[in-house]
UniProtKB/Swiss-Prot annotation:
Keywords per UniProt: Sporulation
Swiss-Prot/TrEMBL GO biological process terms: asexual sporulation; sporulation resulting in formation of a cellular spore
Statement: the UniProt record of this protein carries the keyword Transcription regulation: no
Induction context: Expressed only in the forespore compartment of sporulating cells.
Gene label: sspI
Protein name listed in UniProt: Small, acid-soluble spore protein I
Pfam families xref list: SSPI (PF14098)
InterPro entries tied to this protein: SspI (IPR017525)
Organism: Geobacillus sp. (strain WCH70)
Family: Belongs to the SspI family.
Domain of life: Bacteria
Length: 71
């Protein structure tokens, strides 16, 4: 069986509202289980592909600061 993870994740949330999307993200992060990381990666990939250069720069700055706090 060839499971296309990207397609499965997108299909699973395709009709979700903003609030439902937020709940999905927050729940996955709070649970802290590694099994949710691929799905979060797919969501981030979609955010990245649909963001402006300015938004990408802001995300990168935020990410840089966040990872430095954990170093």
């Amino acid at each position: 069986m060839d499971l296309n993870l990207r397609h499965a994740v997108i299909q699973n949330i395709a009709n979700n509202t903003k609030e439902q999307l937020e709940d999905t993200i927050v729940d996955a992060i709070q649970r802290g289980e590694e099994k949710y990381l691929p799905g979060l990666g797919v969501l981030f990939e979609e955010i990245w592909k649909h963001s402006s250069e300015q938004q990408k720069e802001e995300m990168l700055t935020t990410l840089e600061q966040a990872v430095k706090q954990h170093a």
